[in-house]
């Protein structure tokens, strides 16, 4: 308990909020590194995932590659890339963390398109829509919550892993952990960890809100309709009797 109080004392110490190595600067660096990593991963993985989800081809290969990429030890890859390139900038961890972020983004993209009701796609084709129109006007809008969910999962992994990437001389919140360890300032180490957790929670909350906002209203209505009626094609509304109302004796 004393260590936690000391960590919060370090976080709220005004002296730690000034200068190039202060909390705002390190927080901005960490957020920028994470955003850059997510953008690179999305640019690579989302188009591939959309192509796989739309055509249904190479899904098994995508699953296998995603599993293999998840198994790569990220810290080991960061150090390895730094050694073979003799580069101590953000490039080695940026490459390694982009590789880490690709699998969840890829999975979210192709599983999102696979979740779209095939009857909806068949109806779009029957209306004369081209494959590109089906992709951009039907499949992507309906699968957007799952696509955002994949990016959301990748964001949390990236934010956490950029912390250990500070084993190289780069910025970010991980600097507080490694610099604190070097001088045995455990309040600084724990305070840096608290900041990483706070950044991850805020990021997750933002993505959760976005994920809810991109859900099409028709999808929600469709779920209510399925609950109220076993027949998915029966419209919701007042029931109409199957026989005429009146004097049956006439």
Enumerate the language-model features and the residues they cover:
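Alpha-helical membrane-interface segments at transmembrane helix boundaries
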Residues: 24-32, 66-69, 82, 86, ...
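Periplasmic/extracellular loop-to-transmembrane helix junction in inner-membrane transport proteins
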Residues: 1-38
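C-terminal transmembrane helix and the adjacent membrane-cytosol boundary/short C-terminal tail
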Residues: 56, 111-114, 118, 190-250
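Short cytoplasmic-facing helical segments at TM-TM junctions of multi-pass membrane proteins
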Residues: 108-147, 173, 177
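Glycine-rich helix-loop "coupling/hinge" segments at transmembrane-helix boundaries
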Residues: 66, 83, 161-190, 194-196, ...
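Cytoplasmic-entry segments and transmembrane alpha-helices of multi-pass inner-membrane transporters
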Residues: 48-81, 97, 107-115, 122
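Transmembrane alpha-helices
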Residues: 35, 132-165, 187, 191, ...
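Loop-to-helix entry region at the N-terminal start of transmembrane alpha-helices
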Residues: 25-33, 82-104, 143-144, 188, ...
